[in-house]
Amino acid sequence: MSEFTNLTRSDLKIVTDEGKELWLPTSGVFTRVSKSVRSIYMIDGVPITDISYHIDGVPDSAASGENYVVSWKTLMTMKALGYEVDDIYAPDSFLRDASGKVVGARSLSRIV
């Protein structure tokens, strides 16, 4: 069975439709997106900022049978930058408490 390594800063609780709970504690290793401003200029009075994104803490794809959990922003940026993301997932269908705070997710999703 495959294992999941949580590369986010928060512990993650997955609650399936059947009520089964799976806890994915943060691994202490974080994969995140960083942004660099490359230039700022104007077009017809509108400020334009050219930016580039970078991924810090990319997991070693050679780890056999390992699956990784990152944020949606990180997953989408990795895909856009051409990283292989077959073994990288993000929380989906968030669960919220009465005050609207995210307390878990119903599933993990990946980009295919």
Describe the predicted segments one by one:
Residues S2-K13, E18-V112:
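Intrinsically disordered, low-complexity segments enriched in small/polar residues
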